[in-house]
């Protein structure tokens, strides 16, 4: 008898729940069927610089070590062009600008001498991503991205111990979710960017007459850049 009551209750509740779900308003139901659509994004990013010290001593016996102890925040803005390839696949191109700063701490192990350098950057970025989306659930749809990003730093340079090359290339992996609002689609996204190149400038003729600075430069083997990007897309 109890089993029959449970079954009867389920039969009464499930159709009502299904009807309630069907009654929910689907915002922009045909938004994902467009072949091409445009948008823009704003957000912030965290920059990191992985420095590899070679441990070599200078001619006067000093050992300098450099590091970036923490991620540094910055601002980013992009435009977006999205090409629909399939129900679950989109190709996205989102050129833009990333503005940021990295602080390098340098220390001589024997004497305890320290020095800092602020590296300001203004990147022109050219990201290309493959967006892989799941199924839409009412007004939301999760997705992941995989792609690459070329960057060109247009900031001014000075004769400092660390001078970075202006170009770099990143492998990118991201995760986000589309939220379908009445008048546009809103997508919060987090992306992890892994630099593939050694961006440290090793040939430094500008430091020929600055031996104290050259000692720090020569103590570094390579430098690679990483970023975490938090973006809000409006499409």
Model-found features: residue ranges?
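Short glycine/proline- and aromatic-enriched beta-strand/turn motifs that initiate or cap beta-hairpins
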Residues: 18-72, 233-235
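Outer-membrane beta-barrel channels and translocator barrels
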Residues: 33, 86-88, 135-139, 180-184, ...
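Membrane-spanning beta-strand positions in outer-membrane beta-barrel proteins
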Residues: 37-39, 90, 129, 139-143, ...
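Residues on the lipid-exposed face of transmembrane beta-strands in outer-membrane beta-barrel proteins
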Residues: 40-44, 75-83, 95-97, 126-134, ...
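Structural signature of outer-membrane beta-barrel domains
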Residues: 45-49, 98-102, 149-155, 193-199
